[in-house]
């Protein structure tokens, strides 16, 4: 195999996580604008033209709602625990390490721990996540730490520490 084919094959072997990480590294170098909103590697909580967030609580549950503008992309964090999500209104394409799929509201989805999603809103969309909140947190920092990892490394560290504690 010649060198060009070898390099080309290696480039194509980048994992979903590596591609997302590369994209985010480049995005964090840019200033927020009408088309790009980020929080320098932390979860975005502030409303913008692209996305509005609502946080609600019920006993043992944290509800995180995103109202996405048509054409908005969201790169989610890695979820530490299984959870349920609802597409209440709209039409989205969701990409994960398993590929991409289109969803039209109404839809109920189940996400496994370790999943990171990239969501594209083809039209105005209401996307509702339902997370565990066994400690009844109301502090978003604590809820995010409990439910999300911002990087693959953080998620892998979480899994290792959980496995050590359960041994």
Model-derived segments and spans:
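Short acidic-glycine-tyrosine-enriched beta hairpin
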Residues: 96-117
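Glycine- and acidic-residue-biased ligand/ion/polar-headgroup-sensing regions
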Residues: 79-98
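A short, N-terminal "cap"/entry segment at the start of jelly-roll beta-barrel domains
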Residues: 1-60, 97, 145, 156-167
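Structural motif
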Residues: 84, 91, 116, 124-126
